[in-house]
C-alpha cells in the first residue's frame, strides 16, 4: 500500500492503490455519520449526531483509497497532557490493509505536533492498539475521560472496554 498523509509517507509494492489520510472537512460529515452509526448499532462506538460531527469535524481524519472513503478516526483533548483516540472505524474496503494503523499514526503525529505526551483509548480492539505501541492500563487513571464521556454512557457502571495508553515523550 502506498500511504500519503500530511508529512507522513510510506511506500510498498507497486500496483497497490494509494491510501491517503487527510484532515476531515464538512463534506465528510455524512460518511462519518453513517460509519459511526453502524458501529454504534453494534455497541462498539458511542453514537454521534450529524450536528456534533459538524462541530467536531476538525478533530477527525479520513482515510481514502482511490478517492473513496474507507475509514476515520479522531483525537480529543482530555487535558493539557492527554488526548484520546476516538471513533477509529473502517469499512470493508479498508479492513485488512493496514488502514487503521495509518489512521492511528496520523493521530499520533498530531498529538506529537501539539506536544501532548500521552494518548489513550477505551477499546475492544486491544490487539490492534498493542501492535501499535500502546499498553493496557487501568481505566481509573483517566478521571478526565470518566467525567466527560463515561458519565453519559449506558455502560457506565458495567464498562467492558479496555483502557490503553501510549506515552509519546
Which ranges hold each PLM region?
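C-terminal "cap" of GNAT-fold acetyltransferases
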Residues: 2, 142-169
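Short active-site oxyanion
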Residues: 19-20, 113-119
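A short helix-loop-beta-strand connector motif used in the catalytic cores of GNAT acetyltransferases and
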Residues: 51-66, 84, 157-160
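A short, internal acetyl-CoA/4′-phosphopantetheine-binding micro-motif in the GNAT/acyltransferase core
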Residues: 88-95, 124-125
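Conserved beta-strand in the GNAT
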Residues: 62, 68-77, 81-89
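Conserved active-site alpha-helix within GNAT-family acetyltransferase domains
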Residues: 117, 123-150
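Conserved acetyl-CoA-binding loop-helix of GNAT-fold acetyltransferases
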Residues: 96-111, 121
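Short amphipathic alpha-helix that is part of the acyltransferase structural core
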Residues: 2-47, 64, 161-163, 168-169
Amino acid at each position: 500500500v502506498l500511504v500519503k498523509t500530511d508529512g507522513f509517507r510510506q511506500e510498498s509494492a507497486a500496483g497497490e492503490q494509494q491510501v491517503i489520510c487527510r484532515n476531515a472537512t464538512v463534506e465528510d460529515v455524512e460518511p462519518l455519520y453513517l460509519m459511526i452509526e453502524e458501529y454504534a448499532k453494534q455497541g462498539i462506538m458511542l453514537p454521534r449526531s450529524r450536528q456534533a460531527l459538524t462541530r467536531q469535524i476538525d478533530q477527525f481524519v479520513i482515510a481514502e483509497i482511490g478517492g473513496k472513503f474507507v475509514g476515520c478516526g479522531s483525537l480529543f483533548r482530555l487535558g493539557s497532557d492527554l488526548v484520546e483516540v476516538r471513533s477509529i472505524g473502517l469499512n470493508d474496503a479498508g479492513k485488512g490493509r493496514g488502514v487503521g494503523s495509518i489512521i492511528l499514526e496520523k493521530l499520533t503525529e498530531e498529538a506529537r505536533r501539539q506536544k501532548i505526551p500521552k494518548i489513550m483509548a477505551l477499546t475492544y480492539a486491544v490487539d490492534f492498539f498493542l501492535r501499535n505501541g500502546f499498553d493496557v492500563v487501568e481505566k481509573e487513571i483517566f478521571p478526565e475521560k470518566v467525567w466527560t464521556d463515561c458519565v453519559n454512557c449506558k455502560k457506565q457502571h458495567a464498562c467492558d472496554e479496555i483502557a490503553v495508553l501510549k506515552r509519546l515523550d
